[in-house]
Amino acid sequence: MKTVKISAYYAILLALIALICTALSTGIYLLTKSKIEDEINKQRQALLLEVVPQAYFDNPLSENCQRPNSEKLRAQRIDRLCIATKNNQKTAYAFETVAPDGYAGRIRLLVGITPTGTILGVRVLEHQETPGLGDKIETRISDWILSFSQQQLRSDNLADWAVKKDGGKFDQFAGATITPRAVVNQVKQSALSLLDELNQEN
């Protein structure tokens, strides 16, 4: 009988400890949730400014983002589209897209583009490429990704939109052609899809 009472006591004690720990964890989460969300929003806004400079818009760009309705855009793996406006005129777009064929898997990109096809900037949001080789797509490692800035995408220069090994004008990396090829191809194809969609709207 005494053993049963002791066991019940410890069971209740453990339950109370678990309850207190859960309450503390929940409290910490609730206290830090807004700070974490604020930090994520700040990082997102900073990245948006890297691909669509402030001079292009006077609207709250990060608040004007949504999943595109167009099946064509979604088929090109454009899963988030932000619209920049200035004086109520659409001046640029920022979109997230995924290159599915990186050396080590998917490469998530953020692309800024004008309605006339000028690439304002490209940044890598996420990747798993090989350190020392494919990770040169990051600005902290290399300035390669900056080579997209101010490049014009037109029907008469599509052949240029490839790595040099494939006859284009973009550099590849020594020992790592697959990664830059995947990025160039995805920027090209997704941007062309967006421009085609915009032309149909007009």
Curated annotation (Swiss-Prot):
Protein's recorded name: Ion-translocating oxidoreductase complex subunit G
Sites of FMN phosphoryl threonine modification: 177
Cofactor(s) the protein needs: FMN
InterPro entries attached to this UniProt entry: FMN-bd, Ion_transpt_RnfG/RsxG
GO biological process, alphabetically ordered: electron transport chain
Gene Ontology cellular component annotations, sorted alphabetically: plasma membrane
Species, as recorded: Pasteurella multocida (strain Pm70)
Broad class of where this protein is predominantly found: membrane
Topology class, membrane: Single-pass membrane protein
EC number: 7.-.-.-
Localization: Cell inner membrane
Keyword Translocase attached: yes
Disulfide bonds: none
Molecular function GO terms recorded: electron transfer activity; FMN binding
Family per similarity comment: Belongs to the RnfG family.
Domain of life: Bacteria
Enzyme class per UniProt: translocase
Alphabetically ordered keywords of this record: Cell inner membrane, Cell membrane, Electron transport, Flavoprotein, FMN, Membrane, Phosphoprotein, Translocase, Transmembrane, Transmembrane helix, Transport
Subunit structure, as described in the record: The complex is composed of six subunits: RnfA, RnfB, RnfC, RnfD, RnfE and RnfG.
Function text: Part of a membrane-bound complex that couples electron transfer with translocation of ions across the membrane.
UniProt signal peptide: none
Gene label: rnfG
Key word Signal present: no
Transmembrane segments: 11-31
